[in-house]
Every structure is written in C-alpha cells, then in structure tokens.
Regions:
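C-terminal beta-strand of the catalytic ATP-binding
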Residues: 117, 207-210
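Conserved adenine-nucleotide phosphate-binding loops and their immediately adjacent elements
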Residues: 1-7
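Conserved SAM/SAH cofactor-binding pocket of Class I
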Residues: 13, 20-125
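Conserved beta-strand segments of alpha/beta enzyme cores
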Residues: 4, 61, 87-89, 189-192
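Mobile active-site "lid"/loop adjacent to the S-adenosyl-L-methionine
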Residues: 117-148
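Class I S-adenosylmethionine-dependent transferase superfamily signal
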Residues: 25, 53, 130, 152-156
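Conserved Class I SAM-dependent methyltransferase catalytic core
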Residues: 143-208
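Proline-centered flexible-loop/turn and helix-kink motifs
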Residues: 58, 84, 135, 186-187
Length: 211
C-alpha cells in the first residue's frame, strides 16, 4: 500500500491480496463518517494493515496484535519507523486476549483480520513450499483453513460497537464459506464480499447488528 516496511523470517511477508483488505477497510471507515475511528488489526503480522490505516486515516487509533513475539517486534519496528507510535499500539497475545484491559469493549469501529487460512493437510501437500521461508503459524488454520476466522467472528462482537464492521481476508474459494459463517451468526448483518481484479472473492465483511 505504498509503505516501506521491515520484514523478518518470523513474520508473513505481505501479499498483494492483503492490499485489497486494507483499501476495503479504509473505504468502509470513510463511508462510516467516524471522526476518530478505533480499529483493531488482528493477526497483524508485520503491522502493514495497521500502519496503512494510520497513514491514510490520520485521526484513527489502532490496536494491533499477534501471537508471536517475532511479529510483534517487526510490527513495532514498522510503527516506530513511520512515526506512528502515538496512534498505533502493538501487543502480543492469543487473539482478543491481547487486548484485555484496554477498555475497548463495544467501542471499536472496525476489526481487520488477515488470519492464517490454509488447512493443515494442504500445508503437508501442495502448499508445503510456503514453509521454506515463512513460519507455520502464518499459514496453518486447522483442518479446513477456517479455525481462526471462526474464533474471531465469535469473539469480535464483544469489541465492536453496534454498526461496527469486521473484515477478513480469505483464501481462494473460501469467500462463500466465510460469508456463510457471518450469515449464520445472529450478531452480524449486511454481509458482503469484495473481489479482486480477477473476480475472486478475497475479502468478506459483516457489520455488528444494531439491535
């Protein structure tokens, strides 16, 4: 998204498809007309999404978190290098556990999440090459590649304000499955999918139900 970022062996290198998640999040936040949006970047990796949102939306405050110390260190380095330390905080923890005690419950305008989304079986098969340079934690997501999506979708309503939005990056062919997870939950409404230039659904989002 036009930013120069540090990367490291313990963090996923940002992919082009993640730019679609970032631009969709920024456009959605702008359309919500929130003066000073509060944003969570879940599974932040290098912090690329948190930094991009902070640069494009100067009034936003972002809480980024990841499970591994390697990712947290790289993300903090990128935040510091871009001079965003006053608006972007990076924490280590297991999903929303990293944000306990921050006072964010029912206050967050948007949660962006680029989670691992490759099944364990595929990582042992046709996607095994991904592990040559990047950590398993960046890719592995249970038997169907959706375990993190399911956990985040379940826990996000604790933090989203009514009308707030949860946005996921998804793997090829996962868009309908993730949209179905949203639609089967009573906590969400206005579910939609955003396709890339090839017509492939790579971002799925839903809004926290207002009533």
């Amino acid at each position: 998204m036009g930013l120069k970022l540090l990367v490291a062996p313990g963090a996923l290198v940002p992919r082009p498809e993640t730019e679609l998640l970032g631009t969709t999040a920024i456009e959605t936040l702008r359309s919500m007309n929130v003066a000073a949006p509060l944003v969570i970047d879940m599974c932040c990796g290098t912090g690329n999404l948190a930094c991009a949102i902070a640069v494009r939306l100067p009034e936003a405050r972002i809480w980024a978190c990841d499970l591994t110390q390697e990712c947290v260190d790289v993300a903090r380095g990128n935040v510091d290098n871009l001079g965003l330390g006053d608006r972007v905080a990076v924490s280590r923890g297991d999903l929303f556990g990293a944000l306990s005690g921050q006072g964010l419950e029912k206050a967050v305008d948007a949660i962006v999440c680029n989670p691992p989304y490759i099944s364990e079986k595929r990582l042992e098969g046709d996607r095994a090459h991904l592990l040559a340079r990047e950590p398993r934690e960046a890719f592995a997501a249970g038997p169907y590649g959706l375990s993190i999506h399911m956990k985040v979708l379940k826990e996000a309503p604790v933090f989203l304000r009514p009308g707030g939005v949860l946005l996921f990056e998804v793997g090829l062919g996962q868009d309908r499955q993730v949209a179905g997870l949203f639609e089967r939950s009573a906590a969400y409404e206005a579910v939609s999918t955003v396709a890339n230039g090839e017509g492939e659904g790579r971002v799925v989002l839903g809004h926290s139900r207002r009533s």
